[in-house]
């Protein structure tokens, strides 16, 4: 049961210095992505790669970041690059990854923040339902495309690269339980792509469950001395995610946000705790706020385990048609 009032979160510990480090932040032009980028630069991050769908908007973000007093004080001459990444399209993911591998020798940190929520059923160019494509499929492809590059960088630096994937406790309440169960003879992605299986207010939850299930399958296949991967839920944060709601619902939700939601700064602390502070013990784990938690009941249930197994097999089959997969994806 989610408590209405969220617990107090302490700031990041002092003394974090990211001089010489490079971070890639997806969905970096607004909301949590922009806030995380700002906080990283205040921590003296040398190079920030803003992976954004709208390059013009991303370029405007550079100007605002360079005008931030905290960045001017602690990190007056960072390198900030904008690169196009449209998570709605596989070809954009692959072009982004190719350019990154060619132009950025070492990536120390990859923050998978880009995501969408929608109450409308739409299809991406791949044929997948759009929320599934953006939140799940494209993130998996991006990790597959960049994993060897992250590992190579870790060998150069002597420190593991980090992948921190922004998740949500909402994965605990998917539509699969009651409203739109996956049939025994039905594929997971096949189910997600059926319009009749689209439950508007739970589709975001569904995709976040797919993300955490994939992470639980992938993490044991990775060497945490080379790459540490984790996921976290920053709780309800005061961002523009509710803008997709109809006006009458948005008004209600905005009242709840005004009472309950955390400032974006606090959400940034939670994401960067997973990315920078949590140690190797966080590898393959879900952090609720800053706390490493056990797998949720839905994940460990027979239904969850069946979905996890099928999802891994289906995802690997699809990804193998798009790219040469690293050994850990086989």
UniProtKB/Swiss-Prot annotation:
The active site is at 204 (proton donor), 208 (lowers pka of active site tyr). Disruption phenotype: Loses the ability to produce yanuthone D. Also leads to the loss of production of yanuthone X1 which does not have 6-methylsalicylic acid (6-MSA) as a precursor. NADP(+) binds at residues 57, 86, 113, 204, 208. It comes from the Eukaryota. InterPro entries: NAD(P)-bd_dom_sf (IPR036291), SDR_fam (IPR002347). Keywords: NADP, Oxidoreductase. One of its GO terms (biological process) is terpenoid biosynthetic process. Pathway: Secondary metabolite biosynthesis; terpenoid biosynthesis. GO terms for molecular function: oxidoreductase activity. Disulfide bonds: none annotated. Its EC number is 1.1.1.-. Yanuthone D is an antibiotic against C.albicans, methicillin-resistant S.aureus (MRSA), and vancomycin-resistant Enterococcus. Short chain dehydrogenase; part of the gene cluster that mediates the biosynthesis of yanuthone D, a fungal isoprenoid epoxycyclohexenone that acts as an antibiotic against fungi and bacteria. The first step of the pathway is the synthesis of 6-methylsalicylic acid (6-MSA) by the polyketide synthase yanA. 6-MSA is then converted to m-cresol by the decarboxylase yanB. The cytochrome P450 monooxygenase yanC then catalyzes the oxidation of m-cresol to toluquinol. Belongs to the short-chain dehydrogenases/reductases (SDR) family. PANTHER family: DEHYDROGENASE_REDUCTASE FAMILY PROTEIN, PUTATIVE (AFU_ORTHOLOGUE AFUA_3G08550)-RELATED, RETINOL DEHYDROGENASE. This is Short chain dehydrogenase yanD. It comes from Aspergillus niger (strain ATCC 1015 / CBS 113.46 / FGSC A1144 / LSHB Ac4 / NCTC 3858a / NRRL 328 / USDA 3528.7). The lineage of its organism: Eukaryota, Fungi, Dikarya, Ascomycota, Pezizomycotina. The gene is yanD.
